[in-house]
Amino acid sequence: MIMAEKVRDLRSALERLKNMPGQLAETDVAVDPMAELAGVYRYVGAGGTVKRPTKEGPAMIFRNIKGHPDASVAIGVLASRKRVAALLDCEPENLGKMLYHSVEKPVAPVEFQGSPPCQEVVHLATDPDFDLNRLVPAPTNTPDDAGPYITLGMCYASHPDTGLHDVTIHRLCIQGKDELSIFFTPGARHIGAMADRAEELGQKLPISISIGVDAAIEIGSCFEPPTTPLGYDELSVAGALRKEPVELCHCVSVNEMAIANAEYVIEGEVIPGVRVQEDQNSHTGYAMPEFPGYTGPASDQCRLIKVKAVTHRRNPIMQTCIGP
């Protein structure tokens, strides 16, 4: 499969989809991120998550987000094998083999040289008007959700003892103007182990959350043990998939790195000794829709991230999905 422009970030990915008939829909109609955006996409896209036969619908860009005049929201970018294969320069029938072999030939990330795109605009938590709800157009998919969810945030952190890095995707809910909850599946995720060790040491764990990246990074971030054991940086898988290293930059407010070509980066620290109720604002008892088709229960064991900064590109594109 030969494509014109190489996919290196979300914007080049969307440009590629524009050139594929039926794979991307755009709208300038105003849409509310509170329970409306996801509902629209359910009907324009592939429908419900468990309906059979499985349908293929287009990805979608919402250009007019209520409350966020300078931002757009992209959804469903990875919602079909055909799209994922196209974004990775692969035939759909060879996608599984490509993912398998990517672990065998990792390409380590490198440091970005110059001014990173993700830091074109910087908001510090010390700014008087700082508010995650205003800065990040995270959708609330249903009225029962615990709050606005970041479903495609690439969480990047380092082990307190070894300094080894890891990237994973976790469910993140905006809890306040400078607070996020993060859910770690017990015993299953690398950054959860890092946060546990930092807590044992009585330390905060610096973390960056990069939103709006290319498909290789998102898919690489989903690799888990035993395929990629603790200490294996999954950005090396992404590098193998995209056939060039992922570029990282230094955060502006915490001692950690972030993905330089991301649309948004949220910087913060996982606070030791603190657990929060996921639905502490909505009191619905639910978290968010899960991919099998049900709404998952809210956790009372979420860790708390105290946000220190939000950086983003000019006219940023929030990337999301319905369900994790």
PLM segments and residue spans:
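Extended, highly charged
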Residues: 2-304, 308-324
